[in-house]
Amino acid sequence: MGNPTFKSYYQDQLMAFPPTLDDLVPKSHTVRVVSDIINKINLDVLIDSYESKGRASYHPAMLLKVVVYGYINNIYSSRKLESACKENVHFMWLSAMNYPDHNTINRFRGVKLKDTLRSIFDEVVMLLAQEGLLSIKEVYTDGTKIEANANKYTFVWKKAIQTNKEKMKKQLESIWEYAQSVSDKEDSLPDPPDFTNIDSEKVKKAVDTLNKALSKTKNVDKKQRAKMNYITKNFPGNIEKYEQQEAILGERNSYSKTDKDATFMRMKEDHMLNGQLKPGYNVQISTSNQFIVNYTLHPNPTDTRTLQAHIEQHESSFGKVLESLTADAGYGSEENYDLLETKNIKPFVKYNMFDKQQNTNFNKKTSFGSDKLHYDPDKDVLYCPMGQEMSFIGHAKRKTTSGYEQTLKKYQAKNCHGCPLNGACHKSNGNRVVEINHSLKKHREKVHELLNSEEGIEKRKKRCYDVEPVFGNIKNNHKFKRFMLRGKEKVEIEWGLLAIAQNIRKKVA
């Protein structure tokens, strides 16, 4: 049997005309697209953020290319990006043989891009729009929750703070009552202050007053003395801590001590199947042809209250150009419908019962719900299932958690006694009373017609394969399920880089 033959292999062979890095990068490679796009956009805002004094800095265009290309290839760590610039031909070509270390990359990402990345992202979107790849006028909007880089056991809950403050209030009232009962008549305590809105100033004054009163009193009960010592030692510090925590919470119900901007939310990835809450951010995006056109981050676990800020960001970036918005039932509130109507944006936005109403079997069922009652606008009356008039009896006002005020009308039937449908129609005693939100009802009727039009059916179909696959691609294909940076400002930078990376990947595909 003969010897095997191999191709020549001389590791130390010198080359008379060695190839350049440019020769090693294919002409159609993604890395060239990254370089071309960043070369075309205006980076003046980023360049102006550098000072003219001191040692020469790495060029921001080079650092931006390296970071964006890293995010395209699932390289999110600054240390791995540092290594790639020394070991990977594509990164070496992008950086022109510069070798920024991980501290430089981190400072660039966390500091230099803080006030500039949004304008860079907008420039990329406008460049793609000019090429006809996307539209900034018709978008598909959806949200997802992404876990924050925070310890899931370092939580602060608003309810816990309120409970602790209520306990403090009761203990102060109790010790005050005791001090009044044992104090001398000439040194008797006045009535206790109002602890309803307890704060640090009230607590400090109350503690000082109680200590003075009890110090003048003989034979103070040992348990009460121990209780007063505990209050003196802990309450002033605790109430200050609670006030600081409430200031951080704002309108939220929780936050993480590790990342104070993160809110505890229920994630889709629940491997223990116990509904555990984790600190995270609600990421909202608008897409067109699977390109990300706009993004915002929110502390709200639900999508309903995110739409206004999301649209305002779109207008801030591109002006008032939005013509239509398509979204799921999570956005179908009266407040959002009013917002879209005010801004003349076509609302292809489902409401919570829309999908059920599409089912013919559901519509055939006899329903006694208030939305099924016939309304006569001329008489301003409703008709119950038995045909009896239900007269208007007054208004009801409600405020949503966002502060939006809803106006409802109340109607009452005249005689439900002895009605054969009484048990099925309503369970309460007396005549049936219903509340109707006519404004929301009109919005839903308009949206129902719009969604069932030819254009609406097409929009509903496209939403499923336009915006939703973008999240699936980023979270599953590119393994980004948890932010690496902390604080909302840095997390927004991170998501902005992911959005630019997604758009370039889509352009190349």
Predicted regions and their residues:
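Hydrophobic alpha-helical membrane-insertion signals
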Residues: 1-32
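Anion-binding and metal-coordination hotspots
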Residues: 4, 8, 67, 74-87, ...
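A generic alpha-helix surface/boundary motif
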Residues: 15, 63-64, 122
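Basic, short loop/linker segments at the boundary and entry of helix-turn-helix/winged-helix-like folds
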Residues: 26-68
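A short secondary-structure junction motif
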Residues: 40-45, 88, 92, 477
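Conserved catalytic-core motifs characterized by acidic clusters
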Residues: 95
